[in-house]
């Protein structure tokens, strides 16, 4: 039964992912087939590396292997940090507002003059608290949050650490799941060549700072499925729930991993143990979420103007229900035309219902496909928006600024690399239909599927998928290697 369920999942994933890949190629605003051809060449090169070059690393002793890997990672980290400093940008949009609000938090231990913003954009509160704690430490060295180069330097450092931690966790997962030195090396190379990691290195925002938490949840699950002792299994399930909560507090979409974990618990063990693990996960998540909400209500924010300012979550679903699914000033003004939160919910629910009722089945399919392509088919993940406001002039402007000589080659490289990853993920899923795999690989696949479904309804932006790119890179690496027998 479990084997059949795995086959059905991977078959469904193939259909959905294949449709996204196909439409990403033919709807790309430039030459999609050319980028696909380059992506196929890159995939062939990665396959050749995984077959004939990297397996030689499996013969190294653990001491020599660690020396090689740690040296390579240290060089990568140094280059990554240097690039982040060169790419330093003037914060824009909500990132700028969050940074501007931090002195209020640091001065009072809560938000006073900025309470109104966090009533409206409560989703950014977790980001503000994370940055606030980090800038408190930076303040010990005389650094304060502002839009200057020295003011953003601590944020850039935190972001670099988060991205490097994500790469390290991904390599650790490759070791745990795929077992070999070659698998770790392949995963590391896929990450090192993934340009959006470099491009987002100076942008300390929720898309990057939430990334390690999803991987920690995946790592906890990988350890959970191997643990025989009941108490430790429950502790690991609770740890996974805690990791999901902290990721969710920074970026709400991370919560889909909790649903994927619940599904995997029941696929991995008997119902009694699965229920116990699910209870531990929900208890950890629920206690943390409840405490977080209570802290907001009791201390962090002045909620006096809640009825006048608060925006219900339905607004973002309303944005995602028409046109290209992006921000709509008309929706926002309609929501603010009524006086209470309850009235806004009712009004927005009516607008959402009316928007979807206006589509024929074919129109709805076209609309959802268009949203999926915007979200999953952009090789830059909207990085160009943040890089368009550099702090100072340097040689990187030759490729990060639109209209410069290196900009279009960068765009084509990023798109070709995305197509390579998409093709490898599709190939791995197709192989999993014939030889079903579960465990962390299936958890990654179910999590990506959950995000696809969620973002088909939510406001549409390519960067909203960015914090799940490590899951795609893990699936791509696994597609190039034979899965261990125990994972099947």
Labelled PLM ranges:
Residues 167-193, 439-442:
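Transmembrane-helix signature of polytopic, membrane-embedded enzymes
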Residues 108-112, 297-393:
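Membrane-proximal stem/loop segments at transmembrane-domain junctions that anchor or position
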Residues 196-210:
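Short acidic/glycine- and proline-prone juxtamembrane loop motifs at membrane-interface regions
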Residues 154-178, 216, 424-430:
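Transmembrane-helix motifs of polytopic, lipid-linked glycan transferases
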Residues 17-20, 24-25, 29-39, 150, ...:
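Membrane-interface anchor segments at the N-terminal boundary of transmembrane helices
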Residues 100-103, 117-150:
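Short hydrophobic/aromatic helix or loop-helix immediately within or flanking a transmembrane segment
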Residues 96-120, 126, 325-330:
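Extracytosolic helix-loop segments that constitute the early lumenal/periplasmic catalytic or substrate-binding loops
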């Amino acid at each position: 039964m479990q084997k059949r369920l795995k086959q059905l999942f991977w078959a469904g994933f193939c259909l959905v992912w294949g449709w996204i890949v196909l439409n990403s190629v033919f709807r790309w605003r430039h030459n999609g087939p050319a980028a696909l051809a380059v992506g196929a060449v890159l995939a062939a090169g990665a396959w050749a590396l995984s077959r004939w070059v990297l397996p030689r690393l499996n013969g190294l002793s653990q001491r020599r292997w660690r020396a090689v890997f740690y040296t390579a990672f240290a060089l990568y980290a140094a280059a990554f940090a240097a690039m982040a400093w060169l790419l330093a940008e003037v914060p824009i949009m909500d990132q700028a507002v969050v940074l501007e609000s931090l002195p209020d938090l640091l001065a009072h231990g809560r938000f006073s003059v900025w309470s109104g913003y966090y009533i409206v954009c409560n989703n950014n509160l977790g980001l503000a608290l994370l940055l606030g704690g980090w800038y408190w430490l930076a303040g010990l060295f005389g650094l304060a949050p502002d839009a200057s180069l020295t003011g953003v330097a601590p944020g850039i450092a935190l972001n670099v650490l988060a991205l490097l931690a994500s790469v390290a966790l991904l390599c650790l997962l490759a070791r745990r799941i795929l077992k070999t030195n070659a698998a770790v090396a392949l995963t590391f190379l896929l990450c090192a060549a993934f340009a959006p990691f470099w491009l987002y290195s100076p942008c300390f925002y929720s898309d990057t700072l939430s990334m390690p938490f999803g991987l920690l949840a995946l790592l906890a699950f990988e350890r959970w499925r191997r643990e025989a002792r009941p108490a430790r299994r429950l502790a690991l399930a609770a740890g996974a729930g805690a990791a999901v909560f902290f990721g969710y507090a920074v970026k709400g979409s991370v919560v889909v991993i909790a649903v994927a974990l619940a599904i995997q618990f029941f696929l991995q063990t008997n119902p009694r143990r699965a229920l116990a693990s699910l209870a531990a996960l929900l208890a950890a998540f629920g206690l943390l979420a409840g405490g977080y909400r209570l802290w907001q209500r009791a201390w962090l924010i002045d909620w006096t103007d809640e009825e006048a300012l608060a925006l219900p979550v339905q607004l973002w679903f309303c944005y995602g229900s028409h046109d290209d699914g992006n921000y709509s000033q008309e929706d926002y003004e309609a929501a603010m035309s009524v006086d209470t939160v309850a009235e806004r919910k009712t009004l927005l629910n009516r607008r959402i219902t009316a928007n979807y009722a206006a589509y024929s089945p074919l129109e709805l399919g076209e609309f959802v496909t268009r949203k999926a392509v915007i979200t999953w088919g952009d090789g830059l993940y909207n990085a160009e928006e943040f890089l368009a406001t550099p702090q100072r002039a340097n040689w990187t402007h030759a490729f990060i600024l639109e209209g410069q000589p290196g900009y279009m080659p960068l765009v084509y490289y990023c798109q070709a690399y995305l197509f390579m990853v998409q093709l490898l993920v599709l190939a791995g899923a197709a192989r999993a239909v014939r030889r079903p795999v579960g465990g962390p690989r299936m958890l990654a696949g179910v999590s990506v599927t959950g995000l696809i479904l969620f973002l088909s309804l939510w406001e549409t932006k390519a960067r909203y998928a960015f914090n799940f790119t490590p899951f795609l890179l893990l699936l791509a690496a696994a597609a190039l290697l034979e899965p261990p027998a125990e994972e099947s």
